[in-house]
Amino acid sequence: MRKKNKGILILLAVLILLVAVYFGLRTWNAQQEEKAQEEQEAATVHVTDTSAEDIVSLKFNVGNGDLEFSKEDDQWYYTPDKDFPLQHSYPEDMAETVGSITAGRELTDGDSIDAYGLDEPAYTIEYTDADGNTAELLFGDMTGDDYYVMLNGNDTVYTVNSSVIDPFNYTLDDMARLDDYPSIGSGNLVKEVITQNGETTTYDSEDEDQAEDIAAVAGGLGAVSLSEAADYSVEDEDLDVYGLDEDSRITVEATYTQNDEEQLLTLYIGNEDGSGNRYVMLNDSRIVYLISDEICDNILNV
């Protein structure tokens, strides 16, 4: 019995020792990882170091023209036109990127800036933080996959990976938040009512004599793609320019079913643009779209 108890005590001691070694190694590994991270951070060259949340203004030109965005009350806007339907994820990604740029190399004793193409920068990105501090990044020539970069007012030249440009490499059209458009076809179109010059024409799916007409207008409604805009935030006083004022426009009201419930889509059709399109608006939207004459003719059954 004593031998048995002694064996159990030995096994218990070994187990305790193994547990102690395990936790000791785990602690040591964690310390080593933390140390490695600290060393890596210490070796990292920060070109910019500003929290994205603190950035309130972005101004840049990376080959798509001058663009500027501002943030007010945590909301981003296109600075020249606050009514522009901006997808906020774009400036948010830009701020996240530009506020935390690291360099591959820091060239402290290099050539003059013209040797790096920084006397006439290819691109510029400027941001301002909530305290009014401004930083302007100048992008010169490329070296491999990197750009030569410097901060305006600072003589230090860095190499920065070209991916820094990616979040900025969009046109204003790319960053527009366009309206949603429903899926409409002959299978779910219930009725279409067209009002023009005070006269109303109705196409009803329950009228068997209008089966061909319903198929035609449903084909037109189903072919609409809200992908090209002529004006992103039209003012009421400018609607007549597009033939979309109340006295000039054609009103199309389409009743359709979605998830077994009836929905109403209201379209306004205006003038032709001279290039094979017509100006079109959705009810309650400020965006003027371009839709082909052919599609509009099908919607109007002409």
What is each residue range found by the language model?
Residues M1-V302:
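Secondary-structure "cap/kink" motif recognition
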